[in-house]
Amino acid sequence: MYSLRNKVQLIGNLGKIPDVKKTETGKKLVKFSVATNEFYTNNKGEKVKETQWHNLVAWGKLADVAEKFLNKGSEVAVEGKLVTKEYTDKDGNKRSATEVQINELLLLGGKAGD
């Protein structure tokens, strides 16, 4: 029998310096965003670059690695799962946010534009 999994794999570049936080219980987490680019040719024959931004979060030892080694422009490969959280904003509106909770992180060494 086959089972489907919630699995995401991305290769891209960090948009800014990672944001290091601690929970009320003292657990460290690091949040950062990664841009992925896709290229295609439109119906006019022009090459088009389409950028998607993905919000990621690392916990535990991966948070330590992210804090120590990641910087704006760092090229990374990540694997994780999609997690959607619901919250109430400052105006009392219910909102949801989806992020990738990573369980693997590879530093690829390139910078944006390489």
Set out the residue ranges of the language-model regions:
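Single-stranded nucleic acid-binding surfaces, predominantly the OB-fold ssDNA-binding core
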Residues: 1-114
